[in-house]
Curated annotation (Swiss-Prot):
Classification via PANTHER family: HYPOTHETICAL LOC498675
Name under which the protein is recorded: Uncharacterized protein C3orf62
Residue positions, PTM Phosphoserine: 210, 224
InterPro entries: DUF4712
Biological process annotations from GO: cell differentiation; spermatogenesis
Record's keyword terms, sorted: Differentiation, Phosphoprotein, Spermatogenesis
Organism per entry: Homo sapiens
Its job: Essential for normal spermatogenesis and male fertility.
Tissue: Testis. Down-regulated in men with spermatocyte arrest.
Coiled coil: none
Amino acid sequence: MHYIKTWSLLGEMSEKLRRCRKELTAAIDRAFEGVSYSQECTGQQRLELSAAPLSFSLPVHRLLCRRHPLAACSSAAPFAAVPCAPENENPAFATNHAPVNAKPHALCPERKPLTSKENVLMHSSILAPERESWRTAGEGENWRKENLRKDMERDLKADSNMPLNNSSQEVTKDLLDMIDHTSIRTIEELAGKIEFENELNHMCGHCQDSPFKEEAWALLMDKSPQKATDADPGSLKQAFDDHNIVETVLDLEEDYNVMTSFKYQIE
């Protein structure tokens, strides 16, 4: 009786082992079938790629789509052949073999022209020649004077924390008035005018200290003050008025130099 039970247990175990072997064999066969199928698919893809000599990789294909928007760039065939110009042919004159009704792909959309708002905000320099053509000669001169005045006022606002006294404010106001009432358009012209009047004042100072005052005035004014008084009483007054103007400009220059040096020291 004991042997019968043992034999039955061995039979059940052998049956279980047989089923496990069958399942293991089937699993191994399925695994080998999957590997062989993947190898066949890979080989078939390689044959298809080698059969198409004009096929490109995806980045090159996208580049060609950007350069040729009308080329067929369908998502179903991302590696479709794109007509390529020969090496001895100029790419600018290469013919486009794509159909006329072909639509560009979403990866290579055509560039739309800028709107008017974008043109004004991003390319404001395009409108500059038109604005310049609107101005006449007189308007351009007034525009330059206004810009020079605004630049000086902006500099003064930037340096508003500087302790300016009343004389400095008066000097600044005189400079702005001079710009408005003269033909001076730039700081360089103002500096040149001040330098010329400085030399003239230097010469006039030597003339006043010289014992030959009348001869010096005759050389400068092409006539002596005494004769000028006899001939035209207002000419000598005009000469002294001009001299006073030169003195005023020189005082302005000196005050301006003091202000400039003080500004640099603060900075």
